[in-house]
């Protein structure tokens, strides 16, 4: 017997949480005034007249640092529940978490050797 009624709250939440942003975009698209002109295409600098061209290319030096940080920050999300239930899970969970951390350390060493942590 297929017990779909157990997940009714989940499906209702999923449908409502998906419909709210879609409806917000649709309503704003229908109700917003459409005025095209040079003011809409100009850059905004805190109420001051723009000076120069706002479309210039610049290098982001911290991109690789941010990327490595995000990878190792997400690791914390996976390790925190394991640490909270460490005493219940036993030795096999410890070995699995150790392998997980070892893979992350190998990734850090790889990023280090590739120069992702250099300031160049």
Curated annotation (Swiss-Prot):
TM helices/strands, residue ranges: 9-29, 64-84, 88-108
Pfam families in the record: Oxidored_q4 (PF00507)
Top-tier EC class: translocase
Domain of life: Eukaryota
Enzyme Commission number(s) from the entry: 7.1.1.-
GO molecular function terms noted in the UniProt entry: NADH dehydrogenase (ubiquinone) activity; quinone binding
Catalytic reactions of this protein: a plastoquinone + NADH + (n+1) H(+)(in) = a plastoquinol + NAD(+) + n H(+)(out); a plastoquinone + NADPH + (n+1) H(+)(in) = a plastoquinol + NADP(+) + n H(+)(out)
Keywords, in A-Z order: Chloroplast, Membrane, NAD, NADP, Plastid, Plastoquinone, Quinone, Thylakoid, Translocase, Transmembrane, Transmembrane helix, Transport
Location of the protein in the cell: Plastid, Chloroplast thylakoid membrane
Main location: plastid
Plastid as UniProt keyword: yes
Membrane topology: Multi-pass membrane protein
Listed GO biological process terms: photosynthesis, light reaction
Coiled coil: none
PANTHER family: NADH-UBIQUINONE OXIDOREDUCTASE CHAIN 3
Family membership: Belongs to the complex I subunit 3 family.
Functional note: NDH shuttles electrons from NAD(P)H:plastoquinone, via FMN and iron-sulfur (Fe-S) centers, to quinones in the photosynthetic chain and possibly in a chloroplast respiratory chain. The immediate electron acceptor for the enzyme in this species is believed to be plastoquinone. Couples the redox reaction to proton translocation, and thus conserves the redox energy in a proton gradient.
Quaternary structure (record): NDH is composed of at least 16 different subunits, 5 of which are encoded in the nucleus.
Name of the protein this chain belongs to: NAD(P)H-quinone oxidoreductase subunit 3, chloroplastic
Organism: Capsella bursa-pastoris
Gene this protein is translated from: ndhC
């Amino acid at each position: 017997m297929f017990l779909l009624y157990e997940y009714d709250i989940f499906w209702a939440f999923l449908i409502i949480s998906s419909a709210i942003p879609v409806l917000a975009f649709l309503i704003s698209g229908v109700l917003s005034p459409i005025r095209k002109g040079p003011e809409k295409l100009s850059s905004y600098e805190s109420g001051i007249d723009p000076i120069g061209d706002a479309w210039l290319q610049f290098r982001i030096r911290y991109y690789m640092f941010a990327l490595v940080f995000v990878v190792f920050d997400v690791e914390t999300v996976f390790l925190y529940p394991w640490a909270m239930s460490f005493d219940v899970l036993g030795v096999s969970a410890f070995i699995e978490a150790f392998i997980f951390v070892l893979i992350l350390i190998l990734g850090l060493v790889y990023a280090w050797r590739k120069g992702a942590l250099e300031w160049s």
